[in-house]
Amino acid sequence: MALSKMKDLLDLSDAEVETQILDLKRQLFQLRLQKATRQEVKPHQFKHLRHQLAQLMTLERQRQLTQQQTSVQE
């Protein structure tokens, strides 16, 4: 499974970004819980989930900053 690209996420709305961030945080928590209870976990899933989470949080922050800049200019 390849890591997702940022351009794939640009089409998402703000609400979709927020829900995906929450979903990824839950998935990471579940993965950590499985690892702590010594269940089978694929280690690469940590990397993929953290990568996606970072991309979404970056996108969310970029949108916040552009919104602030437009409100300051007006």
From Swiss-Prot:
Keywords per UniProt? Ribonucleoprotein, Ribosomal protein
Kindly state one GO CC term assigned in the UniProt record: cytosolic large ribosomal subunit
Q: Which organism is it from?
A: Cyanothece sp. (strain PCC 7425 / ATCC 29141)
Report the protein name in the record. Answer: Large ribosomal subunit protein uL29
MF terms from GO for this chain are: structural constituent of ribosome
One Pfam family it belongs to: Ribosomal_L29
Looking up Gene3D superfamilies in the UniProt record yields: 1.10.287.310
Which Gene Ontology BP annotations are present? translation
Q: Which SUPFAM superfamilies match?
A: Ribosomal protein L29 (L29p) (SSF46561)
Q: Which HAMAP family match?
A: Ribosomal_uL29 (MF_00374)
Task: Quote the PROSITE patterns the UniProt record gives.
Answer: RIBOSOMAL_L29
Q: Which domain of life is it from?
A: Bacteria
Family recorded in the similarity comment: Belongs to the universal ribosomal protein uL29 family.
| InterPro entries cross-referenced by the UniProt entry | Ribosomal_protein_uL29, Ribosomal_uL29, Ribosomal_uL29_CS, Ribosomal_uL29_sf
